[in-house]
Amino acid sequence: MERPSVRSYSIRGSRITEAQRAAKDALQKVHGIEFTQQEINLSEIFPKSDKVIMEIGFGMGEATAIIAKNHPNNGYIAVDVHPPGIGKLLARIVENDLTNLKVIEEDVHVVLQHMIPDESLDGIHLFFPDPWPKKKHNKRRIVNEGFLALIHPKITKGGFIHIATDWVPYAESIQEVFAASTLFTGGVIEKPEWRPVTRFEGQGIDKDHAVNDMMYLKA
């Protein structure tokens, strides 16, 4: 699978500030991983980590940085395409002296296809992906049959994908996709205490949006 012809994200609204650009330019070579069409060795990147978790889409990076800080024994690879968020997360890495978090600027589909070895990820976090609420845009949602087929071989035996969304129709769609697959087992769970409530999530809660956490284990 190359980069999908129908993207699950939009670059609109990705205006980067001077501070974010400066952080991105200065820090990406140190705390980022450059995209390559060759597999990377996660054991070399995170030699002291008990587990390696991929964060797909991280907004402005607040939750990702908190999770990495609170779980120093895990290694985290954060993948996104939006320059402002990448610059902000790189700055957070420095501010919090995080040695267990790396950033990749690229479409996660091609990152998984080319860079991530099979059975090398202990888990995947997919928190608040774009729900694409308009029916004509539903095909742009990241969670679909092809996505499950892509991530399944990359996850270790007993590994997981944890998804959270505050858009109920999307939560229902996600559950339908997984229910139709034999690759994963699981369903809705209680929000774990370790997952921070981001500003974006808080805004949704203020609007009475119901947040659904879902956990699926590799079958």
What is the meaning of each model-derived region?
Residues 1-54, 65-69, 90-118:
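S-adenosyl-L-methionine
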Residues 82:
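Conserved SAM/SAH-binding beta-strand->alpha-helix loop
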Residues 157-165:
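Conserved beta-strand signature within the Rossmann-like core of class I S-adenosyl-L-methionine
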Residues 171-219:
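Class I S-adenosyl-L-methionine
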